[in-house]
From Swiss-Prot:
PANTHER family: UPF0149 PROTEIN YGFB. GO terms for cellular component: cytosol. Belongs to the UPF0149 family. This is UPF0149 protein Spro_3920. It comes from Serratia proteamaculans (strain 568). Gene3D superfamilies: YgfB uncharacterised protein family UPF0149, PF03695. Pfam families: UPF0149.
């Protein structure tokens, strides 16, 4: 399965969002949906949360809800894939500047943290490797750049940060969605 062939395109999703007057970019919407999934969302309740957070609780018309359902499904599948197929939805192409990509990454991370926080209200209490990754994501969301920075150097740095964010999202998904042992599984074996 080719992820690119099944993902709605960045441009088509941006257009659908704009047509419905939703004030999010495709990157931000993907970040939000990814955050909900990585936080443990497993049912259709994700749609209500998206409506509440982006459209004053009003459901989207089919012209937007269908691409979002497709985006949700593909994102869920890639997060659950053992081959780490998950990718961030970012603008690409010759006409997209490194500054546009940096802004999109910041928006993606901010909305990822929003979605994650909606599903994991005690996010600030998470420790160890996952807690460090979440702290790093908070810092990445606030990163800025100077317009006169070397674009080639910034592009290289951005690629590294995108890869880190991708792996941090996968780590969060693993942490918050893995099956927790039930009480009988925790019980010590009984000697007879």
């Amino acid at each position: 399965m080719s992820i690119q062939n099944t993902f709605p395109s960045y441009q088509s999703l941006t257009l659908a969002l704009n047509q419905q007057a939703v004030a999010l970019t495709a990157a931000e919407m993907h970040g939000l949906i990814s955050g909900l999934l990585c936080g443990g969302s497993r049912d259709a309740g994700w749609q209500s949360l998206v409506y509440d957070l982006t459209n004053e609780g009003v459901a989207f018309p089919q012209a937007l809800s269908l691409p979002l359902q497709q985006l949700h499904e593909i994102t869920r599948e890639t997060l659950e894939d053992d081959d780490f197929m998950f990718q961030l939805m970012m603008p690409e192409g010759e006409t997209v500047s490194v500054f546009d990509r940096a802004d999109a990454l910041s928006g993606w991370v901010n909305h990822f943290l929003l979605g994650l926080g909606m599903m994991q209200p005690k996010l600030a209490q998470v420790k160890d490797e996952v807690g460090e990754a979440i702290d790093d994501l908070r810092n990445i969301a606030q990163l800025g750049y100077e317009e006169d920075e070397d674009q080639e150097e910034l592009e290289h740095s951005l690629e590294e940060v995108v890869e880190y964010v991708r792996m941090a999202a996968i780590l969060c998904h693993t942490e918050f969605t893995r099956r927790k042992p039930t009480a009988p599984e925790n019980a010590k074996p009984t000697l007879h």
